[in-house]
Regions:
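Charged, low-complexity, helix-prone segments enriched in Lys/Glu/Asp/Gln
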Residues: 21-37, 58, 120, 151-158, ...
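N-terminal leader/targeting segments and the immediate start of mature chains
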Residues: 28-77
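N-terminal mature ectodomain segment of secretory-pathway/periplasmic proteins
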Residues: 59-138
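N-terminal type II signal-anchor transmembrane helix
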Residues: 1-30
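Bulky hydrophobic/aromatic packing residues
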Residues: 22, 61, 105-113, 164-166, ...
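Residue-level preference for alpha-helix termini and adjacent loops
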Residues: 45, 50-53, 60-61, 83, ...
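Short, compositionally biased low-complexity segments
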Residues: 24-41, 125-137
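Flexible, processing/modification-adjacent segments and terminal tails
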Residues: 133-194
Length: 195
């Protein structure tokens, strides 16, 4: 009987520890979200003259993605819904999912996923990056980050997604360098923000 009480106590302590760990992760996500949302936004509106000196492919990109007179924004909040594959290519095991993301190019992002039994977040700031997912809301099944390779990957995601959601972040300015590759290709180099 004592062993049963001991095991029950250990199980309760483990569940409490996992719940506290999840709470700490959610607080980190919320603080990061709030910090990204509070970043200053550029002022003014898009004027084609802003890109007149860029290589022709870059200029065409901006003229296609930002209408003249559009307010310049480098942060976007994106709501997603649909299905996510949790299986293999042959048997994708699609599950309903909902997600939300804040993307503040180039400062970082937080992506929060709820796919029923699986949930968690990806994120990046100037100081850190992470991927954290849990089974049943408690049991960690993926927990990586806080290393240079993960950070580079997360920063690449910020830049890639930013080209669709926050093109104003790539207008000429500090940390942005455009160069022509050929008549139909331009390359942008984006400097990561210092912590």
């Amino acid at each position: 009987m004592k062993i049963a009480f001991l095991l029950a106590g250990l199980l309760a302590a483990a569940l409490a520890a996992l719940a506290l760990w999840r709470l700490a992760d959610r607080r980190t996500d919320a603080r990061t979200w709030a910090a990204l949302a509070a970043l200053p936004q550029p002022t003014g509106t898009f004027d084609p003259a802003m890109v007149a000196d860029l290589p022709d492919p870059a200029r065409r990109y901006f003229l296609y993605t930002i209408a003249p007179g559009t307010a310049l924004r480098t942060t976007a909040v994106i709501e997603m819904g649909g299905e996510i594959g949790m299986g293999s290519k042959d048997a994708p095991a699609y599950r309903p999912m909902r997600a939300r993301q804040i993307l503040a190019t180039p400062a970082g992002f937080v992506w929060e996923l709820d796919a029923g039994l699986i949930g968690g977040s990806d994120g990046m700031t100037a100081a850190n990056s992470w991927t954290r997912f849990r089974l049943g809301g408690l049991l960690p099944v993926v927990r990586v980050g806080s290393n240079a390779d993960h950070f580079r990957s997360a920063f690449g995601r910020v830049v890639a997604e930013g080209t669709f959601w926050t093109p104003a972040a790539f207008l000429p300015g500090p940390g942005i360098a455009w160069e022509a590759v050929d008549a139909d290709t331009a390359r942008v180099t984006v400097a990561a923000m210092a912590s």
